[in-house]
Design a protein with these regions (language model features):
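C-terminal motif of bacterial Sec signal peptides marking the signal peptidase cleavage site
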Residues: 20-23
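Bacterial signal peptide processing site
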Residues: 25-27
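Secondary-structure capping and domain/repeat boundary segments
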Residues: 35-38, 42-124
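Extracellular interaction modules
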Residues: 81-83, 103-125, 148, 178-183, ...
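Conserved NTP-binding catalytic cores of kinases and kinase-like/nucleotidyltransferase enzymes
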Residues: 125-217
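Middle-to-C-terminal accessory/interaction subdomains
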Residues: 129, 142, 167, 175-177, ...
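Internal "kinase-insert"/substrate-recognition segments embedded within catalytic cores
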Residues: 194-195, 209, 231-234, 248-351
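Short, well-structured beta-strand/strand-turn elements
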Residues: 229-242, 358
Protein backbone atom coordinates (compact mmCIF):
# COMPACT_ATOMS: atom_id res chain seq x y z
CA UNK A 1 0.00 0.00 0.00
CA UNK A 2 2.79 2.32 0.95
CA UNK A 3 4.62 1.49 -2.30
CA UNK A 4 1.51 2.27 -4.37
CA UNK A 5 1.16 5.69 -2.76
CA UNK A 6 4.70 6.55 -3.67
CA UNK A 7 4.17 5.57 -7.28
CA UNK A 8 1.03 7.72 -7.46
CA UNK A 9 2.86 10.75 -6.06
CA UNK A 10 5.71 10.37 -8.50
CA UNK A 11 3.31 10.11 -11.43
CA UNK A 12 1.47 13.22 -10.27
CA UNK A 13 4.70 15.24 -9.99
CA UNK A 14 5.76 14.15 -13.47
CA UNK A 15 2.47 15.34 -14.95
CA UNK A 16 2.83 18.72 -13.24
CA UNK A 17 6.33 19.16 -14.64
CA UNK A 18 5.27 18.26 -18.18
CA UNK A 19 2.30 20.63 -18.13
CA UNK A 20 4.47 23.39 -16.66
CA UNK A 21 6.96 23.09 -19.52
CA UNK A 22 4.17 23.18 -22.09
CA UNK A 23 2.67 26.22 -20.42
CA UNK A 24 6.02 28.01 -20.39
CA UNK A 25 6.58 27.12 -24.03
CA UNK A 26 3.18 28.47 -24.89
CA UNK A 27 3.88 31.72 -23.08
CA UNK A 28 7.28 32.00 -24.80
CA UNK A 29 5.66 31.64 -28.21
CA UNK A 30 3.21 34.29 -27.26
CA UNK A 31 6.04 36.61 -26.18
CA UNK A 32 7.95 35.93 -29.36
CA UNK A 33 4.83 36.67 -31.32
CA UNK A 34 4.38 39.94 -29.49
CA UNK A 35 8.05 40.85 -29.97
CA UNK A 36 7.81 39.99 -33.64
CA UNK A 37 4.77 42.16 -33.96
CA UNK A 38 6.48 45.08 -32.22
CA UNK A 39 9.58 44.61 -34.38
CA UNK A 40 7.46 44.65 -37.48
CA UNK A 41 5.81 47.84 -36.35
CA UNK A 42 9.25 49.43 -35.73
CA UNK A 43 10.50 48.43 -39.17
CA UNK A 44 7.33 49.76 -40.66
CA UNK A 45 7.81 53.05 -38.81
CA UNK A 46 11.47 53.24 -39.90
CA UNK A 47 10.52 52.61 -43.48
CA UNK A 48 7.92 55.32 -43.20
CA UNK A 49 10.51 57.72 -41.68
CA UNK A 50 13.03 56.95 -44.48
CA UNK A 51 10.42 57.61 -47.11
CA UNK A 52 9.58 60.91 -45.45
CA UNK A 53 13.33 61.95 -44.99
CA UNK A 54 15.11 61.66 -48.35
CA UNK A 55 18.81 60.80 -48.68
CA UNK A 56 20.89 62.80 -51.14
CA UNK A 57 24.33 62.40 -52.72
CA UNK A 58 26.88 65.20 -52.49
CA UNK A 59 30.09 65.15 -54.56
CA UNK A 60 33.04 67.43 -53.74
CA UNK A 61 35.40 67.66 -56.71
CA UNK A 62 38.37 69.47 -58.23
CA UNK A 63 40.58 69.19 -61.29
CA UNK A 64 42.95 66.39 -60.24
CA UNK A 65 45.79 67.94 -62.24
CA UNK A 66 45.58 71.02 -60.00
CA UNK A 67 44.90 69.52 -56.57
CA UNK A 68 42.93 66.93 -54.62
CA UNK A 69 40.06 66.62 -52.15
CA UNK A 70 41.04 65.69 -48.59
CA UNK A 71 38.27 63.72 -46.86
CA UNK A 72 35.23 61.82 -48.15
CA UNK A 73 34.66 63.29 -51.60
CA UNK A 74 31.32 61.52 -52.24
CA UNK A 75 28.81 61.38 -49.38
CA UNK A 76 25.20 60.19 -48.98
CA UNK A 77 23.46 62.34 -46.36
CA UNK A 78 19.88 62.62 -45.11
CA UNK A 79 17.99 65.76 -46.00
CA UNK A 80 18.64 68.57 -43.55
CA UNK A 81 21.83 67.07 -42.16
CA UNK A 82 25.40 68.31 -42.71
CA UNK A 83 28.13 66.60 -44.70
CA UNK A 84 31.39 65.59 -43.09
CA UNK A 85 33.97 68.36 -43.57
CA UNK A 86 36.32 68.09 -46.55
CA UNK A 87 39.12 70.39 -47.69
CA UNK A 88 41.09 71.00 -50.85
CA UNK A 89 44.86 70.59 -51.25
CA UNK A 90 46.29 72.66 -54.10
CA UNK A 91 49.38 71.67 -56.08
CA UNK A 92 52.35 74.03 -56.13
CA UNK A 93 51.96 76.67 -58.81
CA UNK A 94 48.21 77.03 -58.23
CA UNK A 95 45.93 78.65 -55.68
CA UNK A 96 42.41 78.04 -54.35
CA UNK A 97 39.97 80.93 -54.72
CA UNK A 98 36.66 79.36 -53.62
CA UNK A 99 33.97 76.70 -54.13
CA UNK A 100 31.27 76.71 -56.79
CA UNK A 101 28.73 77.04 -53.95
CA UNK A 102 30.16 80.43 -53.03
CA UNK A 103 32.15 79.30 -49.98
CA UNK A 104 35.63 80.79 -49.80
CA UNK A 105 37.39 78.76 -47.09
CA UNK A 106 39.41 75.67 -48.17
CA UNK A 107 37.47 73.49 -45.67
CA UNK A 108 33.77 73.04 -46.37
CA UNK A 109 30.69 71.31 -44.92
CA UNK A 110 27.15 71.95 -46.21
CA UNK A 111 23.56 71.27 -45.13
CA UNK A 112 21.99 68.93 -47.68
CA UNK A 113 18.72 69.60 -49.51
CA UNK A 114 19.32 67.97 -52.89
CA UNK A 115 21.78 65.95 -54.96
CA UNK A 116 24.64 68.23 -55.92
CA UNK A 117 28.28 68.57 -56.97
CA UNK A 118 30.45 71.28 -55.48
CA UNK A 119 33.72 72.03 -57.28
CA UNK A 120 36.86 73.72 -55.98
CA UNK A 121 37.91 76.66 -58.12
CA UNK A 122 41.69 76.54 -58.62
CA UNK A 123 43.74 78.90 -60.77
CA UNK A 124 47.47 79.17 -61.56
CA UNK A 125 49.46 81.22 -59.06
CA UNK A 126 50.98 82.93 -62.09
CA UNK A 127 47.68 84.76 -62.55
CA UNK A 128 48.90 86.93 -59.69
CA UNK A 129 52.44 87.07 -58.33
CA UNK A 130 52.83 86.36 -54.58
CA UNK A 131 53.29 89.30 -52.23
CA UNK A 132 56.04 89.61 -49.63
CA UNK A 133 55.53 92.17 -46.88
CA UNK A 134 58.43 93.12 -44.58
CA UNK A 135 58.10 95.32 -41.50
CA UNK A 136 61.28 96.38 -39.72
CA UNK A 137 61.22 97.20 -36.01
CA UNK A 138 59.88 100.71 -35.69
CA UNK A 139 59.74 100.86 -39.50
CA UNK A 140 63.45 101.70 -39.48
CA UNK A 141 64.92 102.35 -42.93
CA UNK A 142 67.31 99.73 -44.33
CA UNK A 143 70.53 101.62 -45.07
CA UNK A 144 73.36 99.14 -44.51
CA UNK A 145 74.75 96.20 -46.48
CA UNK A 146 76.47 94.83 -43.38
CA UNK A 147 74.20 95.51 -40.37
CA UNK A 148 70.96 93.54 -40.07
CA UNK A 149 67.66 95.01 -38.82
CA UNK A 150 65.06 92.90 -37.03
CA UNK A 151 61.84 92.47 -38.99
CA UNK A 152 58.77 90.31 -39.53
CA UNK A 153 57.86 88.80 -42.90
CA UNK A 154 54.46 87.86 -44.32
CA UNK A 155 53.68 86.09 -47.59
CA UNK A 156 50.29 86.19 -49.29
CA UNK A 157 48.55 85.67 -52.61
CA UNK A 158 50.21 82.28 -53.06
CA UNK A 159 49.51 78.60 -52.49
CA UNK A 160 47.99 78.33 -49.00
CA UNK A 161 50.76 76.07 -47.71
CA UNK A 162 53.38 78.75 -48.47
CA UNK A 163 51.49 81.68 -46.94
CA UNK A 164 52.33 82.88 -43.45
CA UNK A 165 52.23 86.00 -41.30
CA UNK A 166 54.78 87.76 -39.12
CA UNK A 167 57.66 85.29 -39.25
CA UNK A 168 60.67 86.65 -37.38
CA UNK A 169 63.69 87.55 -39.51
CA UNK A 170 66.53 90.00 -40.09
CA UNK A 171 67.18 92.06 -43.21
CA UNK A 172 70.04 94.09 -44.67
CA UNK A 173 71.06 95.47 -48.03
CA UNK A 174 73.27 93.49 -50.40
CA UNK A 175 75.16 93.90 -53.65
CA UNK A 176 77.89 96.16 -54.94
CA UNK A 177 76.89 98.22 -57.98
CA UNK A 178 73.26 97.15 -57.56
CA UNK A 179 73.09 98.74 -54.08
CA UNK A 180 73.71 102.15 -55.70
CA UNK A 181 70.44 102.01 -57.65
CA UNK A 182 67.20 103.52 -56.32
CA UNK A 183 65.58 100.09 -56.12
CA UNK A 184 67.60 98.25 -53.48
CA UNK A 185 68.43 94.52 -53.27
CA UNK A 186 68.21 92.75 -49.89
CA UNK A 187 69.50 89.79 -47.94
CA UNK A 188 66.90 88.08 -45.72
CA UNK A 189 67.73 85.80 -42.80
CA UNK A 190 64.83 84.08 -41.00
CA UNK A 191 65.05 83.15 -37.31
CA UNK A 192 64.13 79.57 -38.21
CA UNK A 193 64.39 77.66 -41.47
CA UNK A 194 61.50 78.44 -43.83
CA UNK A 195 60.41 76.69 -47.03
CA UNK A 196 59.67 79.51 -49.46
CA UNK A 197 57.52 78.34 -52.37
CA UNK A 198 58.61 74.69 -52.17
CA UNK A 199 62.32 75.40 -52.56
CA UNK A 200 63.46 73.64 -49.38
CA UNK A 201 63.87 74.91 -45.84
CA UNK A 202 66.61 77.46 -45.20
CA UNK A 203 67.22 80.65 -43.26
CA UNK A 204 69.02 82.68 -45.93
CA UNK A 205 67.34 84.14 -49.02
CA UNK A 206 68.16 86.87 -51.53
CA UNK A 207 65.84 89.52 -52.97
CA UNK A 208 67.11 90.67 -56.38
CA UNK A 209 65.82 93.87 -57.99
CA UNK A 210 66.71 93.26 -61.67
CA UNK A 211 66.71 97.07 -61.82
CA UNK A 212 69.08 97.49 -64.77
CA UNK A 213 67.43 94.60 -66.63
CA UNK A 214 64.41 96.36 -68.09
CA UNK A 215 62.83 93.03 -69.03
CA UNK A 216 63.16 91.98 -65.34
CA UNK A 217 63.71 88.48 -66.66
CA UNK A 218 67.40 87.64 -67.22
CA UNK A 219 68.14 86.06 -63.84
CA UNK A 220 64.78 84.26 -63.91
CA UNK A 221 65.44 82.82 -67.37
CA UNK A 222 69.00 81.76 -66.56
CA UNK A 223 68.05 80.00 -63.33
CA UNK A 224 65.09 78.32 -65.01
CA UNK A 225 67.40 76.86 -67.67
CA UNK A 226 69.93 75.87 -65.01
CA UNK A 227 67.22 73.88 -63.22
CA UNK A 228 67.11 71.46 -66.18
CA UNK A 229 70.63 70.17 -65.63
CA UNK A 230 71.45 67.38 -63.22
CA UNK A 231 74.82 68.46 -61.79
CA UNK A 232 74.53 72.26 -61.34
CA UNK A 233 70.97 72.80 -60.13
CA UNK A 234 71.60 72.89 -56.37
CA UNK A 235 70.80 76.59 -55.80
CA UNK A 236 68.76 77.76 -58.77
CA UNK A 237 65.18 78.03 -57.48
CA UNK A 238 63.64 81.47 -58.01
CA UNK A 239 60.23 83.11 -57.55
CA UNK A 240 58.95 86.51 -58.64
CA UNK A 241 57.21 88.46 -55.84
CA UNK A 242 55.73 91.89 -55.33
CA UNK A 243 57.65 93.39 -52.41
CA UNK A 244 56.36 95.76 -49.73
CA UNK A 245 58.79 97.13 -47.13
CA UNK A 246 57.28 99.08 -44.23
CA UNK A 247 53.99 99.22 -46.17
CA UNK A 248 55.60 100.82 -49.24
CA UNK A 249 55.31 99.03 -52.60
CA UNK A 250 58.81 98.53 -54.02
CA UNK A 251 58.05 96.63 -57.23
CA UNK A 252 58.66 93.15 -58.60
CA UNK A 253 61.61 91.32 -57.05
CA UNK A 254 63.09 87.87 -57.56
CA UNK A 255 63.53 85.69 -54.47
CA UNK A 256 66.54 83.41 -54.91
CA UNK A 257 68.33 80.79 -52.88
CA UNK A 258 71.55 81.95 -51.26
CA UNK A 259 74.50 79.98 -52.65
CA UNK A 260 75.76 78.27 -49.52
CA UNK A 261 76.66 74.93 -47.97
CA UNK A 262 73.34 73.78 -46.57
CA UNK A 263 70.92 70.87 -46.74
CA UNK A 264 68.75 71.24 -49.89
CA UNK A 265 71.39 73.58 -51.36
CA UNK A 266 75.04 72.59 -51.74
CA UNK A 267 75.13 69.45 -49.62
CA UNK A 268 78.77 68.80 -48.82
CA UNK A 269 80.63 67.86 -45.66
CA UNK A 270 80.91 70.30 -42.78
CA UNK A 271 83.71 69.38 -40.37
CA UNK A 272 86.89 70.69 -38.78
CA UNK A 273 88.98 68.23 -40.81
CA UNK A 274 91.28 69.66 -43.45
CA UNK A 275 89.77 67.33 -46.07
CA UNK A 276 86.24 68.67 -45.65
CA UNK A 277 83.73 70.31 -47.99
CA UNK A 278 84.81 73.56 -49.66
CA UNK A 279 82.80 76.21 -51.51
CA UNK A 280 84.99 78.54 -53.59
CA UNK A 281 84.19 81.66 -55.62
CA UNK A 282 86.32 83.04 -58.42
CA UNK A 283 86.07 86.69 -57.37
CA UNK A 284 88.28 89.53 -58.59
CA UNK A 285 86.58 91.82 -56.06
CA UNK A 286 88.42 89.79 -53.38
CA UNK A 287 85.40 90.01 -51.08
CA UNK A 288 86.71 87.94 -48.16
CA UNK A 289 89.75 85.81 -47.39
CA UNK A 290 91.25 84.68 -50.68
CA UNK A 291 94.21 83.03 -52.36
CA UNK A 292 95.51 83.25 -55.91
CA UNK A 293 96.27 80.68 -58.56
CA UNK A 294 98.29 82.57 -61.12
CA UNK A 295 96.72 86.02 -61.20
CA UNK A 296 93.17 84.83 -60.43
CA UNK A 297 91.83 85.32 -56.87
CA UNK A 298 89.56 82.73 -55.22
CA UNK A 299 87.49 83.48 -52.11
CA UNK A 300 86.75 80.70 -49.63
CA UNK A 301 83.00 80.84 -48.88
CA UNK A 302 82.88 77.65 -46.79
CA UNK A 303 84.15 76.61 -44.32
CA UNK A 304 83.86 80.00 -42.65
CA UNK A 305 87.25 81.67 -42.50
CA UNK A 306 86.02 83.50 -39.37
CA UNK A 307 85.65 80.22 -37.49
CA UNK A 308 88.27 79.34 -34.87
CA UNK A 309 88.39 75.86 -36.43
CA UNK A 310 89.64 77.30 -39.73
CA UNK A 311 93.43 77.19 -40.12
CA UNK A 312 96.09 77.94 -42.69
CA UNK A 313 96.12 74.20 -43.39
CA UNK A 314 92.59 74.43 -44.75
CA UNK A 315 93.58 77.18 -47.16
CA UNK A 316 96.71 75.33 -48.24
CA UNK A 317 94.73 72.12 -48.82
CA UNK A 318 92.12 73.60 -51.15
CA UNK A 319 94.64 75.87 -52.89
CA UNK A 320 96.85 72.85 -53.56
CA UNK A 321 93.91 70.86 -54.97
CA UNK A 322 92.76 73.68 -57.27
CA UNK A 323 96.34 74.16 -58.43
CA UNK A 324 96.59 70.46 -59.28
CA UNK A 325 93.32 70.71 -61.23
CA UNK A 326 94.49 73.80 -63.08
CA UNK A 327 97.79 72.19 -64.07
CA UNK A 328 95.84 69.16 -65.31
CA UNK A 329 93.49 71.13 -67.60
CA UNK A 330 96.53 72.86 -69.08
CA UNK A 331 98.11 69.49 -69.88
CA UNK A 332 97.26 66.72 -72.33
CA UNK A 333 96.07 63.93 -70.01
CA UNK A 334 92.27 64.02 -70.16
CA UNK A 335 91.98 60.97 -67.92
CA UNK A 336 93.93 62.89 -65.28
CA UNK A 337 91.48 65.78 -65.63
CA UNK A 338 88.52 63.43 -65.17
CA UNK A 339 90.08 61.98 -62.02
CA UNK A 340 90.24 65.43 -60.43
CA UNK A 341 87.29 67.32 -61.92
CA UNK A 342 83.61 66.51 -62.46
CA UNK A 343 83.70 67.41 -66.15
CA UNK A 344 79.93 66.85 -66.54
CA UNK A 345 79.20 69.77 -64.21
CA UNK A 346 81.67 72.06 -66.00
CA UNK A 347 80.14 71.19 -69.38
CA UNK A 348 76.62 71.98 -68.13
CA UNK A 349 77.77 75.19 -66.46
CA UNK A 350 79.54 76.26 -69.65
CA UNK A 351 76.37 75.81 -71.72
CA UNK A 352 74.36 78.09 -69.40
CA UNK A 353 77.01 80.83 -69.26
CA UNK A 354 77.63 80.72 -73.02
CA UNK A 355 73.92 80.62 -73.87
CA UNK A 356 73.29 83.80 -71.86
CA UNK A 357 76.69 85.47 -72.53
CA UNK A 358 77.06 86.23 -68.82
CA UNK A 359 79.58 89.06 -68.74
CA UNK A 360 81.01 88.37 -65.27
CA UNK A 361 81.77 84.67 -65.84
CA UNK A 362 85.53 85.29 -65.72
CA UNK A 363 85.45 88.09 -63.17
CA UNK A 364 83.23 87.13 -60.23
CA UNK A 365 80.33 84.99 -58.98
CA UNK A 366 81.77 81.83 -60.56
CA UNK A 367 81.31 79.15 -57.90
CA UNK A 368 82.98 75.77 -57.51
CA UNK A 369 82.86 73.24 -54.71
CA UNK A 370 84.65 70.10 -53.57
CA UNK A 371 83.34 67.57 -51.06
CA UNK A 372 85.58 65.64 -48.67
CA UNK A 373 87.45 63.05 -50.71
CA UNK A 374 85.64 64.16 -53.86
CA UNK A 375 86.29 65.93 -57.15
CA UNK A 376 86.03 69.62 -58.01
CA UNK A 377 82.50 70.51 -59.23
CA UNK A 378 81.18 73.57 -61.02
CA UNK A 379 78.53 75.23 -58.86
CA UNK A 380 75.23 76.82 -59.82
CA UNK A 381 75.65 79.65 -62.36
CA UNK A 382 74.91 83.01 -60.74
CA UNK A 383 74.46 86.71 -61.49
CA UNK A 384 73.01 87.38 -64.94
CA UNK A 385 72.27 91.09 -64.46
CA UNK A 386 74.79 91.68 -67.24
CA UNK A 387 73.90 89.16 -69.91
CA UNK A 388 71.90 88.78 -73.14
CA UNK A 389 73.31 91.99 -74.60
CA UNK A 390 73.59 94.06 -71.40
CA UNK A 391 77.37 94.38 -71.36
CA UNK A 392 78.48 97.77 -70.02
CA UNK A 393 82.11 98.29 -70.99
CA UNK A 394 82.53 94.66 -72.14
CA UNK A 395 81.56 95.35 -75.75
CA UNK A 396 82.91 92.00 -76.92
CA UNK A 397 80.12 90.21 -75.04
CA UNK A 398 77.37 91.94 -77.02
CA UNK A 399 76.96 89.52 -79.97
CA UNK A 400 75.14 86.24 -79.35
CA UNK A 401 77.99 84.42 -81.14
CA UNK A 402 80.79 85.91 -79.02
CA UNK A 403 81.75 82.67 -77.17
CA UNK A 404 82.42 85.01 -74.27
CA UNK A 405 82.53 82.33 -71.54
CA UNK A 406 85.15 80.37 -73.47
CA UNK A 407 87.34 83.44 -73.89
CA UNK A 408 86.93 85.00 -70.44
CA UNK A 409 86.75 82.12 -67.96
CA UNK A 410 90.12 80.44 -67.46
CA UNK A 411 88.58 77.06 -66.55
CA UNK A 412 86.39 76.90 -69.65
CA UNK A 413 89.21 78.19 -71.86
CA UNK A 414 91.60 75.38 -70.95
CA UNK A 415 88.96 72.64 -70.78
CA UNK A 416 87.73 73.50 -74.28
CA UNK A 417 91.23 72.90 -75.65
CA UNK A 418 90.49 69.20 -75.12
CA UNK A 419 88.52 67.54 -77.89
CA UNK A 420 86.91 65.20 -75.37
CA UNK A 421 85.44 68.14 -73.47
CA UNK A 422 84.20 69.75 -76.69
CA UNK A 423 82.48 66.47 -77.55
CA UNK A 424 80.92 66.33 -74.09
CA UNK A 425 79.50 69.84 -74.54
CA UNK A 426 78.07 68.74 -77.90
CA UNK A 427 76.47 65.66 -76.34
CA UNK A 428 74.93 67.76 -73.58
CA UNK A 429 73.58 70.29 -76.08
CA UNK A 430 72.07 67.54 -78.24
CA UNK A 431 70.35 66.12 -75.17
CA UNK A 432 69.22 69.39 -73.58
CA UNK A 433 68.47 71.76 -76.49
CA UNK A 434 64.85 70.56 -76.90
CA UNK A 435 64.34 70.83 -73.13
CA UNK A 436 65.83 74.32 -73.09
CA UNK A 437 63.47 75.45 -75.85
CA UNK A 438 60.47 74.00 -74.02
CA UNK A 439 61.51 75.58 -70.71
CA UNK A 440 62.03 78.99 -72.30
CA UNK A 441 58.58 78.83 -73.90
CA UNK A 442 57.09 78.10 -70.46
CA UNK A 443 59.03 81.01 -68.97
CA UNK A 444 57.81 83.50 -71.55
CA UNK A 445 54.24 82.29 -71.14
CA UNK A 446 54.60 82.95 -67.40
CA UNK A 447 56.02 86.42 -68.00
CA UNK A 448 53.21 87.47 -70.32
CA UNK A 449 50.55 86.10 -67.96
CA UNK A 450 51.97 88.40 -65.30
CA UNK A 451 52.18 91.44 -67.55
CA UNK A 452 50.10 93.55 -65.16
CA UNK A 453 52.54 93.04 -62.26
CA UNK A 454 55.61 93.77 -64.39
CA UNK A 455 54.09 96.91 -65.87
CA UNK A 456 53.09 98.03 -62.36
CA UNK A 457 56.80 97.79 -61.42
CA UNK A 458 57.56 100.46 -64.03
CA UNK A 459 54.84 102.70 -62.66
CA UNK A 460 56.90 102.71 -59.46
CA UNK A 461 60.26 102.93 -61.26
CA UNK A 462 59.67 105.04 -64.38
CA UNK A 463 62.86 104.10 -66.23
CA UNK A 464 61.70 102.52 -69.50
CA UNK A 465 63.16 104.51 -72.39
CA UNK A 466 65.78 106.16 -70.16
CA UNK A 467 69.47 105.31 -69.84
CA UNK A 468 70.26 102.89 -67.02
CA UNK A 469 73.84 101.66 -66.82
CA UNK A 470 75.05 99.18 -68.14
CA UNK A 471 72.48 99.26 -70.98
CA UNK A 472 73.62 100.63 -74.34
CA UNK A 473 71.75 102.86 -76.79
CA UNK A 474 70.11 99.93 -78.58
CA UNK A 475 68.54 98.62 -75.38
CA UNK A 476 67.63 102.09 -74.12
CA UNK A 477 65.49 102.73 -77.21
CA UNK A 478 63.34 99.69 -76.37
CA UNK A 479 60.90 101.80 -74.37
CA UNK A 480 58.28 99.21 -73.41
CA UNK A 481 58.46 96.12 -71.26
CA UNK A 482 57.21 94.01 -74.19
CA UNK A 483 60.05 95.17 -76.43
CA UNK A 484 62.59 94.41 -73.72
CA UNK A 485 61.22 90.88 -73.21
CA UNK A 486 61.09 90.21 -76.94
CA UNK A 487 64.74 91.26 -77.24
CA UNK A 488 65.79 88.59 -74.72
CA UNK A 489 63.71 85.98 -76.52
CA UNK A 490 65.27 86.67 -79.92
CA UNK A 491 68.75 86.76 -78.41
CA UNK A 492 68.30 83.36 -76.71
CA UNK A 493 66.89 81.75 -79.85
CA UNK A 494 69.88 82.96 -81.87
CA UNK A 495 72.37 82.05 -79.16
CA UNK A 496 71.06 78.50 -78.78
CA UNK A 497 71.07 77.95 -82.55
CA UNK A 498 74.66 79.21 -82.71
CA UNK A 499 75.83 76.88 -79.92
CA UNK A 500 74.18 73.91 -81.60
CA UNK A 501 75.89 74.78 -84.89
CA UNK A 502 79.24 75.23 -83.12
CA UNK A 503 79.27 72.13 -80.93
CA UNK A 504 76.80 69.80 -82.68
CA UNK A 505 77.70 70.08 -86.38
CA UNK A 506 75.87 66.85 -87.19
CA UNK A 507 72.67 67.93 -85.42
CA UNK A 508 69.86 68.35 -87.95
CA UNK A 509 67.19 69.52 -85.47
Amino acid sequence: MKRGALVFCAFTILLLIVFGIVACTGNGSSLESNNSSESGNQESNTATDTNEQNAYTVLFSCDTSLGKIIGEAEQTVLEGEKTSPVSVYVNYGYRFIGWSSGATEPEISITVSENCEISAIIVPVSDSIPTVSILTDGKEEITSTSEYLNCVVSIGNANEIYCFENEGAKIRGRGNTTWEYEKKPYRLKFDTKIDLFGNGKAKDWVLLTNYSDLSLSRNFLAQSVTSLFGTINSCCSVQFVELYVNEEYLGVYLICEQIEVEKSRIEITKSVDVDTGYLIELDNRKDGRYFKIGSTPYVIKSPSTDSSAYTDEHEEFIKSYLTECFIAIGGNDYDKICSLIDVESFAESYIVYELFNGVDVGYSSFFMYKDAGGKLHAGSPWDFDRSLGIVGHSKGAKPYDALWAKEQNTWFYWLLRHEEFNSLVGEKLTEYAPKIKEKLNECYEYLYKNREAFEKNFEKWDILGTFVWPNDDELTTLNTWDLQVEYTRNYLNNSLDFLITTYCPNNTN
